[in-house]
Curated annotation (Swiss-Prot):
It is an enzyme of class 3 (hydrolase). Pathway: Amino-acid biosynthesis; L-arginine biosynthesis; L-ornithine from N(2)-acetyl-L-ornithine (linear): step 1/1. It comes from Escherichia coli O127:H6 (strain E2348/69 / EPEC). GO terms for cellular component: cytoplasm. It is found in: Cytoplasm. Homodimer. Catalyzes the hydrolysis of the amide bond of N(2)-acetylated L-amino acids. Cleaves the acetyl group from N-acetyl-L-ornithine to form L-ornithine, an intermediate in L-arginine biosynthesis pathway, and a branchpoint in the synthesis of polyamines. InterPro entries: AcOrn-deacetyl (IPR010169), ArgE/DapE_CS (IPR001261), Bact_exopeptidase_dim_dom (IPR036264), Peptidase_M20 (IPR002933), Peptidase_M20_dimer (IPR011650), Peptidase_M20A (IPR050072). Its cofactor is Zn(2+); Co(2+); glutathione. Its EC number is 3.5.1.16. One of its GO terms (molecular function) is zinc ion binding. This is Acetylornithine deacetylase.
Amino acid sequence: MKNKLPPFIEIYRALIATPSISATEEALDQSNADLITLLADWFKDLGFNVEVQPVPGTRNKFNMLASCGQGAGGLLLAGHTDTVPFDDGRWTRDPFTLTEHDGKLYGLGTADMKGFFAFILDALRDVDVTKLAKPLYILATADEETSMAGARYFAETTALRPDCAIIGEPTSLQPVRAHKGHISNAIRIQGQSGHSSDPARGVNAIELMHDAIGHILQLRDNLKERYHYDAFTVPYPTLNLGHIHGGDASNRICACCELHMDIRPLPGMTLNELNGLLNDALAPVSERWPGRLTVDELHPPIPGYECPPNHKLVEVVEKLLGAKTEVVNYCTEAPFIQTLCPTLVLGPGSINQAHQPDEYLETRFIKPTRELITQVIHHFCWH
């Protein structure tokens, strides 16, 4: 029953008060089960059918799919339930207590992105879901902040094919139709240790890595020359050398050296293509020193994403907002949802607040976000 649904601000408060941190470090990682239960109960109260999906390979994490209406197509509204960890020493407020001050709602997940579910639930108060002409789906995913395991698993297993989807990440209500991907690798070189007084008796891994880095930087230049997408502020794939470590003493021949690097590919570039380019770049080192160089993923890769600029979803949202779609450099779950249907990234709050101490969402987003959600539901599910 709709009258059982708490007021908007109390929904928001309950979501923020329910910790659901994702972290690669097991001691910090938390289940999102309690948050999923909250959402599931509220959507059931609104007349939705609810399915809770355990996500394999995670520490007790779940997706939730709430659905209402019959037939094919329809609209999917999606978002993630998890947050990043927080630095207790840098927050001036309790991260798990929603605090309103000076036109801002403070709390961990207010912008990125638990608040989106509060907006959806509040907008649905005024929607008669029994009269939907096409189905409406609400997807809440797990582990976006680490592996994106929830969105990956949902996209791999669902039979749903909505007409379109909106992911409510904080874009300041500016619609995003494309973003770059992310690939991170560890390059490891195994040398042979020995006393530095006789270099010929060992194989110095740092020297081999120096050779490998030269080839990697040549790949960086080749990517910049070969691939372009002018809509991006940085209109080519970037390659960054982010971390390196090797050796343990100045008088020992270095036995092992490890380099961490990332590539941010443009939409349309395949992960297999990029892996092939990296392997080709490192081939001279591998051929000269067989068995000493390995390449491993640091995190599951995220492909680039693009929604066709002439799709109906783009046209409708641009008309409703009076704003053109944009492209951005950060990553979301959009590449995985895009395998099901055309997808936009669009939500309240600023990406500049994501992952920051004293995270907040400005209250000026409340009214236009509620109106936008109502409008897109009416457009894609009532006609």
